[in-house]
Amino acid sequence: MNTEKSPLISVIVPVYKVEKYLPVCLDSLLAQTYRNFELLLVDDGSPDGCWQIMQQYAAQDSRVRIFRKENGGVSSARNFGLEQARGEYICFVDSDDFVAPRYLEWMYRAMKQTNTELAVCGYRKVSKEADPAGIAPAADEPEIKIFSLEEYYDAPENGELRRAEHAARF
């Protein structure tokens, strides 16, 4: 799904002490079938090699924008990312997570098909040995369900796509 008319999605990744996992996260995001997105990486004062990894990815792909700030916690990093975001839609991904290649495509399509302001997806836990613990099966196509705001009040920051004007501050 790569059309110039597709709206820009801002993917915000707060980064702190995840040197071991960060490349997997970034590779999964840059492999998305939905191509019109910016990837905002916010280094929250990480003392390991995360900043160098972020610089390498930014040098290789113009969609990657990197920022460095004093440690203030994950909420502070997310808020900083929101201030920098230019997209019509906002998505958060934790830096020790990875996503399926059609993640952004499916989330955006679900929002458009149902005319909603928020799309939320499930996830699978993966052990340290990278074996799926399987709380949700992999799918070839997403299953779309519609919930009221009251039914899904506690939507997590990760695993969701929402319009920028509805992006909550933390």
Model segments located where?
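Nucleotide-sugar donor-binding/catalytic module of glycosyltransferases
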Residues: 1-170
